[in-house]
Structures are given as structure tokens and as C-alpha cells.
């Protein structure tokens, strides 16, 4: 038969008829690729050995890159900024950042306290300072007016220590004479040679009418010395400069300019 050799083997023509064309093409391609790889291995190169392995690893890495990119794209969907925004809104806001070195708590309290005081003073729009001013004004109006004391120095014969009398606390000559007696009664008793007791302290009487041992006189703004009680009380208070308690026996020598002036003031 045709297609068979003498030895009984199948001829190439018969093989071509039996094997399909696609199988034959694939077979030739595989055969050629095997020959090519063997030829590459047998080729002489100037580079060091191992470069072929590097080339193969590069090819493998290039094939894996699209797979890695697909994985990253899937991961990006789950960890996108839009998803992180929703979680960030749920978190509580962080506290204020403390500088370095850290400020101690009591210094913070002092600073906050001072800043709050300044804020209260400056907030006139809320009416805080205006209310405080109104309260102060009301307190001033409700408080009684305190007049300045009219203190006048007073000296007594035989007593080296002088005292002061507040004329604004007196309304008449009788009150003034009582105050003078109270001030100098004990001092006169202490000036005596023998020791004195409370019973030995005698009241000082006749200061205004000249019937006692001592008489009360005063010096006015002009330097004139006159008897206390010869002019109205308000006139006396407005013109008195200093008070003196002298002996009644020395009135004539002490009141050098007082008699004529007192007569004019009486008129």
C-alpha cells in the first residue's frame, strides 16, 4: 500500500493526513521554542552568569503587576477618603494642645481668673459695670454724710500735754465745758505732789462764767484771745483756732485785745 514503507512504518505523507493542521502548528511552535531556549542557553555572553534568571524574574514580576494593581484597587474602595470621613465625624474632638514646657494647673487657674475679671470689666454691653456703678452710687446716697471733724487743739494751765477737741461733735458751750472737764480732771490730779485717787479728783467748774478756779478762752483766726461763751455758738465755731484753759486770776493779762472786739461782736 501507499504510505507504508517497506519496513512497515508510516510515511510522513500519511502522518500529515492523519494529524490535523492545528495540532501540527502547535507541535512546530513548541518544537521551535524548545530549540530557541536551548540555543539561548548555549550562547556565549559577556555578562556574568545569572542574568538569564534575572530576566526571567523580571518577566514574572511584569506578569504579576496587573494582579497587584487589581488587589490595590479593591482595597482602595474599602479605605477610600469618603469612608474615613464618616468615621472621623463620629470621633470626639481632641483637647487643646498644651505647649512645652507644660503650664501647671494653678497657673492656668490664675490666668483664667485674671482673664475672666478683665472680661467682666470690659463687658459694658451686658451692663455689668453699669450695674456696679449704680450700686456704688446707691450705697453712697444711703450712707450718712460724714462731715470732716473740726479738731481744735486745747491746752490747760499746769498740764504739759495738750489735747484735741472735735467741735463738730458739740452743739453748745455746755457740752464743750463738760468735755474739757472730762479731759483734764485726771491730768490735774496727777500733777499734784501727793498721790491722788479717784475720790480726790475734783470737777472743773466755772469755765464759762469765770466763777471757778479756771476759765476757758480761745484764739481766733486773727490771733485775738477772747472768752468762750460771749459770742453765738456758730460764730465761735467758724472763727476759733485754739482753746486755752487759764487761771481766772490771769484773765486781765491774757485778754489784751479781746474786750473791745467782743463788745463790737455783741452789737
UniProtKB/Swiss-Prot annotation:
One of its GO terms (molecular function) is DNA-binding transcription factor activity. Gene3D superfamilies: Phosphatidylinositol 3-kinase Catalytic Subunit, Chain A, domain 1 (3.10.20.90). GO terms for biological process: auxin-activated signaling pathway; response to auxin. Induction: By auxin. Pfam families: AUX_IAA. It is found in: Nucleus. Residues 149-248 form the PB1 domain. Its main location: nucleus. Keywords: Auxin signaling pathway, Nucleus, Repressor, Transcription, Transcription regulation. The keyword Transferase does not apply. Signal peptide: none annotated. InterPro entries: AUX/IAA_dom, AUX_IAA, PB1-like. GO terms for cellular component: nucleus. The N-terminal half of the protein contains two conserved domains I and II. Domain I includes a slightly degenerated ERF-associated amphiphilic repression (EAR) motif which seems to be involved in the activity of transcriptional repression. Domain II is required for the correct degradation of the protein through the SCF-mediated ubiquitin-proteasome pathway. Interactions between Aux/IAA proteins and auxin response factors (ARFs) occur through their C-terminal dimerization domains III and IV. Aux/IAA proteins are short-lived transcriptional factors that function as repressors of early auxin response genes at low auxin concentrations. Repression is thought to result from the interaction with auxin response factors (ARFs), proteins that bind to the auxin-responsive promoter element (AuxRE). Formation of heterodimers with ARF proteins may alter their ability to modulate early auxin response genes expression. Belongs to the Aux/IAA family. This is Auxin-responsive protein IAA18. The lineage of its organism: Eukaryota, Viridiplantae, Streptophyta, Embryophyta, Tracheophyta.
Amino acid at each position: 500500500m501507499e504510505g507504508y514503507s517497506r519496513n512497515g512504518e508510516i510515511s510522513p505523507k500519511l502522518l500529515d493526513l492523519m494529524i490535523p493542521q492545528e495540532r501540527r502548528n502547535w507541535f512546530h511552535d513548541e518544537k521551535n521554542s524548545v530549540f530557541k531556549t536551548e540555543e539561548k542557553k548555549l550562547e556565549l555572553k559577556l555578562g556574568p552568569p545569572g542574568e538569564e534568571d534575572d530576566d526571567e524574574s523580571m518577566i514574572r514580576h511584569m506578569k504579576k503587576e496587573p494582579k497587584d494593581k487589581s488587589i490595590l484597587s479593591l482595597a482602595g474602595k474599602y479605605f477610600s477618603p469618603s469612608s474615613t470621613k464618616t468615621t472621623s465625624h463620629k470621633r470626639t474632638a481632641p483637647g487643646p494642645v498644651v505647649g512645652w514646657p507644660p503650664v501647671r494647673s494653678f497657673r492656668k487657674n490664675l490666668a483664667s481668673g485674671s482673664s475672666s475679671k478683665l472680661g467682666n470689666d470690659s463687658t459694658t454691653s451686658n451692663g455689668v459695670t453699669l450695674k456696679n456703678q449704680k450700686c456704688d452710687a446707691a450705697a453712697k446716697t444711703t450712707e450718712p454724710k460724714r462731715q470732716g471733724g473740726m479738731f481744735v487743739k486745747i491746752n490747760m494751765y499746769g498740764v504739759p500735754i495738750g489735747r484735741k477737741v472735735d467741735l463738730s461733735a458739740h452743739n453748745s458751750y455746755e457740752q464743750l465745758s463738760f468735755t474739757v472737764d472730762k479731759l483734764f480732771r485726771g491730768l490735774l490730779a496727777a500733777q499734784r505732789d501727793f498721790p491722788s485717787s479717784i475720790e480726790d479728783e475734783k470737777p472743773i467748774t466755772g469755765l464759762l462764767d469765770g466763777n471757778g478756779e479756771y476759765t476757758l478762752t480761745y484764739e481766733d483766726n486773727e490771733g485775738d484771745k477772747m472768752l468762750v461763751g460771749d459770742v453765738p455758738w456758730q460764730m465761735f465755731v467758724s472763727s476759733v483756732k485754739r482753746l486755752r484753759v487759764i487761771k481766772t486770776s490771769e484773765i486781765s493779762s491774757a485778754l489784751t485785745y479781746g474786750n473791745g472786739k467782743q463788745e463790737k461782736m455783741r452789737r
